[in-house]
Amino acid sequence: MQSLVIFILLVIFSTSTYAQQRPQESFNLNSWNVIVATGTFVSPQFEGSKHYRVLPLPFIRASKGNYFIQTEGPGLTANILNHSRLKLGPSLQFRSERDKDVKNSVLKKFKTINSSIEAGGFLSYSIPVGAPGTNITTKIKAMFDLGDAHNGYTINSSITFNKVLNRRTRIGITLSTNFGDQNYNNTYYGLSAYNKIISGYSLYEAGSGFNDIGSSVNVTYSLKNNWGLIGIFGYKKLIGPAKNSPIIKNIGTRNQFLSSIGVSYRF
């Protein structure tokens, strides 16, 4: 898997270099399109949790032609390629801590896992299929811990079917999976000697591997005067090292849901 990570980084670097060598359009803020949205996001308190939390959902996207910069969950990503199908660029992401604020009484006693800032990049490619506005997009995104929260990396792979249903409604259906290296998986799914004493659960050292497989549906509906509605519903099943974790087996669940609803405005 380390070879795959190196390959991804080489592709990102080489493609970025190629993009910089191509003639670029002049930069003009007035020609950028901006979308802002706000709403609520419901997700598990931590990976594998039975309990959920409700968070605000701010979103902003600025685009010009094929270029864009946008928020993506608790992070930021940008496309640096002037290409209609191929997208590539850097990403930053915040991962929240797992501390004593969780609802489970056993997990409250575990050592806190600090929050982290992660950096990496993504690469995606879209293939038009059928009617205009319909495409299939494959995407891979690698993120690395910049601090000492887990000192590891994750790789998200996904494939999305996008379709314009009518002049107001768009839908996206995504299948995805997440891979974590040993450092990442052992931090969030492993059980140390200290936590074994606290909980009475078995010691567990999680190895690298795929941790989940999931799907989501994203629907956008355009209203009048540049307003719109956004709805997202997702589900994933924990597998591999995550499934075998004593934390998931004893106080968590393999079934993870998320949902979001928001209102958007296009400038």
Where are these regions (language model features)?
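Cleavable N-terminal export/targeting peptides
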Residues: 1-30, 252
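Short loop/turn motifs that connect adjacent beta-strands in outer-membrane beta-barrel proteins
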Residues: 20-33, 48, 67-86, 128-136, ...
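Residues that define the transmembrane beta-barrel architecture of outer-membrane proteins
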Residues: 32, 52-58, 84, 113-119, ...
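Flexible, solvent-exposed coil segments and beta strand-coil junctions
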Residues: 35-41, 98-104, 134-141, 192-201, ...
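Transmembrane beta-strand segments that form the barrel wall of outer-membrane beta-barrel proteins
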Residues: 36-44, 67-77, 104-108, 135-146
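Residues on the lipid-exposed face of transmembrane beta-strands in outer-membrane beta-barrel proteins
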Residues: 38-42, 58-64, 76-80, 121-125, ...
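Outer-membrane beta-barrel transmembrane domain signature
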Residues: 129, 146-228, 236-243, 249-250, ...
